[in-house]
Swiss-Prot record:
Mg(2+) binds at residues 103, 225. Residues 228-248 are annotated as: Linker. The gene is glmU. The keyword Metal-binding applies. Acetyl-CoA binds at residues 378, 384-385, 403, 421, 438. Binds 1 Mg(2+) ion per subunit. Residues 1-227 are annotated as: Pyrophosphorylase. It comes from Chromobacterium violaceum (strain ATCC 12472 / DSM 30191 / JCM 1249 / CCUG 213 / NBRC 12614 / NCIMB 9131 / NCTC 9757 / MK). UDP-N-acetyl-alpha-D-glucosamine binds at residues 9-12, 23, 74, 79-80, 101-103, 137, 152, 167, 225, 331, 349, 364, 375. One of its GO terms (biological process) is UDP-N-acetylglucosamine biosynthetic process. Its EC number is 2.7.7.23, 2.3.1.157. Its cofactor is Mg(2+). This is Bifunctional protein GlmU. Homotrimer.
Amino acid sequence: MDSLSIVILAAGKGKRMYSSLPKVLHPIGGEPMLARVIRTARALNPSRLVVVYGHGGEQVRARIQDADIVWAEQAEQLGTGHALKMALPHLPQDGKTLVLYGDVPLTKASTLQRLEQAAAGGMAVLTDVLADASGYGRMVRGADGKLQAIVEHKDCTPEQLAIREINTGMMALPNARLADWLSALNNGNAQGEYYLTDVLELAVKDGVAVESASVDASWEAAGVNNKVQLAELERILQANQARALLEAGVTLADPARIDIRGELKHGMDVSIDIGCVFEGAVELGDQVEIGAHCVLKNVKIASGTRIAPFSHLEDAVVGAECRIGPYARLRPGAELAGHVHIGNFVEVKKSKIGEGSKVNHLSYVGDAEIGRKVNVGAGSVTCNYDGVNKFKTIIGDNVFVGSGTLMVAPVKLERDSTIGAGSVISKDTPAGELTVARARQVTVPGWKRPQKKSG
């Protein structure tokens, strides 16, 4: 089999995005458009992957740091043919080259494989048929149905404007012919650019077989030139991902109200309520329930756990049969064993919480290690930061922490101890004992509140 090279054209400025961010770095599905195109390209196992960059090149290369990518600069944006010419020195003289676009993010790998296969005897172009082909290059065929040329919209005759089959821009080309064809391009057109599409006519003149492959859906070939189009493709992507979840057995309260900005793995009988956002790598075990308006980023949740509405979890691990929220926040480094309860307005960061422990109300747990079957009362805080350094709180098994307790780290509460409500614990507490650290209650007879002066 011929070796396959892939060239991704990503040099455009994107004026209509009205942004200092290069167009190909605008996100879709939680990652830059260019990153998504690269990921799709890799599914074809190319021997070489070249990205042609131009506008905002430093930003693009800083964001996409894959070591195996070959970078080719197009200092002046003189058209797609000129862009591919910039990649030519990096391509082998044999095999095929697949040309993709950094602002066309939703093309499926299976479609590109069909395009590659169609070019087995020469070159191939990926096409689509649109009800309204305005703005697109038209596929001009002869009486025998064979492709003869691609004519850009601005250069079309009235008869050609009636053609509905359009060029998506993606094509597969024989490397042995590339240098000659690209050198033969001229910019004698309405745009004054070197069109890659003119290669098709050169191929026909040279007697090279030109075939076509079609997309399965028009959104596969849809490009992004402005924020409206980006938003439209984002919704299409999210709808596709939601449908895939439904087909795999996940229950979605409303498929139109879920956003997946990364990879979501799941077990059986998972249910997700409305308005949830999944970012990065998220893994949900069997029978996990996610309540409305939760945000999960890089988390792993074991089977049977329920996340109540409006909870935020990031870089956290949650054990089986836990109850989280509502309005709970698990920050990076939170590790919960099984059957843990984290209630409303509780924040946990860089802490391990043991089997069956509960932190149910209005509390902060940071830089802590909590044992099994611990109860942390409402309004309790691990005071872990002195303004410069952070310190650890250790709570042993079966400790009961009364409401409103401040634990000033570094401090250790030994197993089976009880802490009286309202205590400020700054020293280690002994096992199995009651510790109370608060001022004695005092009543001042006859005390009066200060009064505001009248007038």
